[in-house]
Design a protein with these regions (language model features):
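A cross-domain feature marking catalytic cores of carbohydrate-active enzymes
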Residues: 74-76, 103-107, 130-134, 169-171, ...
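Conserved strand-turn element in the central/C-terminal portion of the radical SAM core barrel
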Residues: 155-178, 198-200
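Flexible glycine/acidic-rich beta-alpha junction loops that bind and position SAM and/or redox cofactors
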Residues: 174, 194-223, 244
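Active-site and channel-lining beta-strand-loop segments
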Residues: 256, 260-261
């Protein structure tokens, strides 16, 4: 399934350029996250299998002809499970120098040989985002079937090779008190960490035992201010935000990479 991000659509009519393409390569994922559409609505997966199947190389080539930047990020799949993912990655980096590649993954289920090749292809224009929701030993509480400790080893390995990576950390009830320690751990290995609010609690009456509380809800408050302000371009407050014992600057973006001050 290939989607064009309409908020970032940029046609130059004489060249027919699409600025960003978001690609969901198929329907496969090894995890069973409680609030994922895969878990809650398995009929969607069956429909997608019948209707779309997996992205084929011939179709991917068409995307490369038009898209400047590529994001591999599954709504119902994880890109690393596509059997041709390394081929797609190799094809992408051979295109013009201005092309950037973003890969979002839970990072679990591939053998070392696969990662060796993936990271060898990722030295320049590729940025990986690993979803590790909590400290390595606790991420599986939401990302069911994930071995967070092995994913953390893969992340450290990637960093040691000079690969660009980000640690994406979604606050939940079980991990909100681990944020300080996670920030220290990320800093120790010089890995940027991003706190990202889950939108899947909206209008929901189940899984409330997972919903974070206290200071981490500043993300919800900030989004509320943005949506309800007369000035739709309202910027986040410039003062520091305190989460646990760690303070963060909040300029630029609601979902920015958070770096300890």
């Amino acid at each position: 399934m290939i989607n064009v991000d309409t908020t970032q659509l940029h046609y130059v009519y004489n060249r027919k350029i699409i600025k960003y393409a978001h690609i969901d390569l198929g329907t496969k994922c090894l995890l069973e996250c409680p609030m994922c559409p895969r878990t809650e609505h398995p009929e969607i997966i069956e429909f997608s299998k019948r209707t779309y199947g997996e992205v084929k190389i011939k179709d991917f080539k068409k995307v490369l002809s038009y898209a400047e930047h590529i994001t591999f990020c599954g709504n119902i799949s994880d890109p690393i499970y596509h059997p041709k993912m390394l081929d797609f990655l190799e094809m992408t980096i051979k295109y013009p120098k201005h092309r950037n590649v973003y890969i979002h993954t839970n990072g679990w289920g591939r053998k070392q040989k696969w990662w060796d090749r993936a990271f060898d292809l990722s030295k320049n224009k590729v940025k990986w985002t690993f979803a590790l929701d909590g400290l390595p030993h606790e991420s599986h509480k939401y990302r069911v079937n994930q071995n967070g400790e092995e994913v953390w080893e893969i992340m450290k390995y990637a960093k040691s090779l000079g690969v660009q990576i980000i640690w994406q950390f979604i606050p939940f009830k079980y991990n909100e008190n681990s944020i300080d320690e996670a920030v220290k751990l990320a800093k120790e290995y010089n890995i940027p960490i991003k706190l990202r609010r889950s939108s899947r609690f909206a209008d929901r009456h189940e899984h409330l035992d997972l919903k974070p509380t206290a200071e981490v809800l500043w993300l919800d408050k900030l989004e509320f201010l943005q949506k309800n302000s007369k000035d739709r371009k309202l910027k986040p407050p410039k003062e520091k935000i305190q989460i646990g014992k760690t303070s963060f600057k909040t300029e630029k973006s609601l979902y920015k990479e958070l770096k300890p001050t």
